[in-house]
């Protein structure tokens, strides 16, 4: 009988630590709903004590999601654990994930505590978490550089205190597969009460080995893996959920376990996370990249046409890919629109949101003859993004360009419900547009990244623009879509500005 491998998704917590990837409460709820549809076992919704916004997001996800365990991170401090417990009150099933550093350098330089003091604090934290839930996870931060004898000592103590999951993090992505797998195996074998807890892996991708290290951990006894959609996360990111899940499922000849993940929702989850965070999926990204199932070489194409398994080890349709099938047109009705979006995993909270999305669909259908699923997802994502309260709204944009002449952009914005207009003349249409917006917003913004991609194929395709803005040390991403690239650019810039005005810095720890 195949053992169950628990999938612990931390896109909403660790994934959010990607530079500029801060999410609003509504964005976290949207991603959490998709994770629930995917049948993710545990959703780490945030770090409840980090900010009021984080607390509200954890609380909202806990109240809405019914079929996944909802988790909040908490340092091994009473105030953190109490805040997490309060945020999780409404959850159908909850978990508190507490942690403390265990490597010599962290204990000495960061915590300024002795090993015995660290053990005592960890035990007290687990016992306090038990006031709120009997589902308690403990992580020895920087376990990859910790002394193994000390790891055995502290893990045995926290299991005895009530920890039910032991998560071994490679916080700085330092380990390599055989080393990390051996650590997991040794801990399970050496700790007397290891059978009372599930062992978990949390790997970072600094050396490009997060998925490989996690798979090695599974082969050596770990039965939970912590991961993020698209491998999002601080620095080089975390273990990629889609890669880990499909590796285990594809190689059942090697792994004696499998996940409960409904892989049909992998692609939609990937695109949603990309849209919300502004982190574009590279074309050659395994499983979800545009080229993941493409075959250029003639010999490969011939082989696939004759028999798929000659060059494909997975079916594209099993992770949500289709053939860019034309699904709707300008004569399609509201109900057909709603039904198609439901099949794509998109739901609306009220008729007003549906009507707004349908209006935008009709506007798009007048500009673009062929409407694909990717168009619908991009359109709805923008609709839901703009449904949030915004201090700045784009009313109109007029751009005049001429070869070898400066470009002129006239922008009309609503700023705090006041209509304002500005014109700028510069060497480029995008630069002129951004300059005009900046003059109206009256804040100095540093543009760190500007990228354009097409949502589908064709000259009339929707263009998706992503910008990364920096303001007073804060980094945010903004997204915009339109059949006109300059308009999409303006939308993305305004979206980023609104995030600058609302997103606050949060003290997220590393694990």
From Swiss-Prot:
One of its GO terms (cellular component) is cytosol. The gene is leuA. Mn(2+) binds at residues 14, 202, 204, 238. One of its GO terms (biological process) is L-leucine biosynthetic process. Belongs to the alpha-IPM synthase/homocitrate synthase family. LeuA type 1 subfamily. PANTHER family: 2-ISOPROPYLMALATE SYNTHASE 1, CHLOROPLASTIC-RELATED, HOMOCITRATE SYNTHASE-RELATED. GO terms for molecular function: 2-isopropylmalate synthase activity; acetyl-CoA C-acetyltransferase activity; manganese ion binding. Catalyzes the condensation of the acetyl group of acetyl-CoA with 3-methyl-2-oxobutanoate (2-ketoisovalerate) to form 3-carboxy-3-hydroxy-4-methylpentanoate (2-isopropylmalate). It catalyses: 3-methyl-2-oxobutanoate + acetyl-CoA + H2O = (2S)-2-isopropylmalate + CoA + H(+). Homodimer. Keywords: Amino-acid biosynthesis, Branched-chain amino acid biosynthesis, Cytoplasm, Leucine biosynthesis, Manganese, Metal-binding, Transferase. Its main location: cytoplasm. This is 2-isopropylmalate synthase. Coiled coil: none annotated. It comes from Vesicomyosocius okutanii subsp. Calyptogena okutanii (strain HA). Pathway: Amino-acid biosynthesis; L-leucine biosynthesis; L-leucine from 3-methyl-2-oxobutanoate: step 1/4. Its EC number is 2.3.3.13. Residues 5-267 form the Pyruvate carboxyltransferase domain. NCBIfam families: leuA_bact, PRK00915.1-3, PRK00915.1-4. Residues 393-511 are annotated as: Regulatory domain. Its cofactor is Mn(2+). It is found in: Cytoplasm.
């Amino acid at each position: 009988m195949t053992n169950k491998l628990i999938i612990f998704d931390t896109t909403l917590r660790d994934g959010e630590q990607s530079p500029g990837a801060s999410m609003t409460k509504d964005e976290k709820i949207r991603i959490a709903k998709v994770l629930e549809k995917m049948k993710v076992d545990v959703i780490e919704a945030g770090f409840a004590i980090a900010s009021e916004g984080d607390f509200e997001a954890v609380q909202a996800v806990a109240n809405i999601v019914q079929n996944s365990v909802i988790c909040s991170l908490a340092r091994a401090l009473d105030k953190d654990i109490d805040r997490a417990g309060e945020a999780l009150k409404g959850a159908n099933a909850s978990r508190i994930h507490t942690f403390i550093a265990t490597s010599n350098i962290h204990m000495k330089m960061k915590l300024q505590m002795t090993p015995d003091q660290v053990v005592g604090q960890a035990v007290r934290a687990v016992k306090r978490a038990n006031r709120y839930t009997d589902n308690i996870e403990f992580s020895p931060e920087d376990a990859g550089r910790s002394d193994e004898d000390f790891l055995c000592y502290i893990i045995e103590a926290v299991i005895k205190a009530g920890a039910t999951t032991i998560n071994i993090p490679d916080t700085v992505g330092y380990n390599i597969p055989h080393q990390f797998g051996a650590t997991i195996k040794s801990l399970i074998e050496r700790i007397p009460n290891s059978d009372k807890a599930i062992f978990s892996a949390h790997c970072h991708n600094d050396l490009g080995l997060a998925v490989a290290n996690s798979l090695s951990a599974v082969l050596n006894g770990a039965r939970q893996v912590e991961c993020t959609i698209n491998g999002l996360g601080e620095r080089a990111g975390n273990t990629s959920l889609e890669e880990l899940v499909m590796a285990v499922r594809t190689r059942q000849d090697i792994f004696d376990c499998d996940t409960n993940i409904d892989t049909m929702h992998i692609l939609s989850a990937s695109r949603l996370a990309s849209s919300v965070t502004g982190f574009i999926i590279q074309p050659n990204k395994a499983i979800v990249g545009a080229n993941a199932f493409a075959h250029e070489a003639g010999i490969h194409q011939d082989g696939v046409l004759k028999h798929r398994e000659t060059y494909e080890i997975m079916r594209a349709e099993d992770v949500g890919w289709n053939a860019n099938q034309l699904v709707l047109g300008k004569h399609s009705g509201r109900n057909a629109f709603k039904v198609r979006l439901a099949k794509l995993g998109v739901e609306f909270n009220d008729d007003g949101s549906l009507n707004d999305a349908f209006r935008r669909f009709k506007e798009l259908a007048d500009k673009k003859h062929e409407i694909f699923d990717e168009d619908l997802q991009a359109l709805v994502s923008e609709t839901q993004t703009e449904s949030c309260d915004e201090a700045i709204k784009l009313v109109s944009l007029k751009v005049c360009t001429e070869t070898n002449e400066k470009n002129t952009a006239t922008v009309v914005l609503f700023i705090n419900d006041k209509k304002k207009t500005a014109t700028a003349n510069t060497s480029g249409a995008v630069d002129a547009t951004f300059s005009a917006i900046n003059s109206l917003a009256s804040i100095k913004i540093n543009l760190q990244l500007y990228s354009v991609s097409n949502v589908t194929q064709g000259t009339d395709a929707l263009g998706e623009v992503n910008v990364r803005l920096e303001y007073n040390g804060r980094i945010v991403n903004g997204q915009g879509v339109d059949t006109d690239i300059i308009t999409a650019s303006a939308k993305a810039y305004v979206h980023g500005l609104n995030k600058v005005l609302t997103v606050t810095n949060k003290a997220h720890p590393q694990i």
